[in-house]
UniProtKB/Swiss-Prot annotation:
It catalyses: GTP + H2O = 7,8-dihydroneopterin 3'-triphosphate + formate + H(+). GO terms for molecular function: GTP binding; GTP cyclohydrolase I activity; zinc ion binding. This is GTP cyclohydrolase 1. Zn(2+) binds at C95, H98, C166. InterPro entries: GTP-CH-I_C/QueF (IPR043133), GTP-CH-I_N (IPR043134), GTP_CycHdrlase_I (IPR001474), GTP_CycHdrlase_I_CS (IPR018234), GTP_CycHdrlase_I_dom (IPR020602). Disulfide bonds: none annotated.
Amino acid sequence: MHSAVEKVAEDLSLSRENLSLEEVEKAIRTLLLWVGENPDREGLLETPKRIAKVYKELFSGYGESVDEILGVVFEEVAGYDEPVIVKDIFFYSHCEHHMIPIIGKAHVAYLPDKKIVGLSKIARVVDVFAHRLQTQETMTAQVANSLKKYLKPRGLAVLIEAEHMCMAMRGVQKQGAATITTSFHGYYKKDQVAQANFMTITRGIR
């Protein structure tokens, strides 16, 4: 059964399919006019088509399902009972308030309880949610909740550190400012030493 988040993604995907490429390009052409440009000049003739194509790629997460990525897990762990940590998962996203890029890295750790997953699938889960309009807080919770649902680990930790271009390019214009969000569950929620070890491994060792 799909989660509420996945159901919303499906509904949005259906809405997108009902829009023709011509309608999307027309909207982009209108935007070019609004900012004061001439969409008929040589350099902009193909711009609406290019933007439509790149947006389909940048927001591909609306057409992807975490169920398909995490639907298959492995139950043979050969007695391994220590944390699995995947760090420095680079991603780019876009803030839902200004549609300006968010660029950052995600770090994930989980303490298996008879279930493990291919390491690349953790990175793919990050990408699914990154390729949607986001707030960093929501994305952190979505990644954590998805892994928790399918792996049912004894402990789970997710840390995302990112620079928001909406803070660097406009408004206060503070380039280089990093935002850090975390989500701890189970063992990592209860054990402060485990939390500290996770923070040291993901942020303290380079």
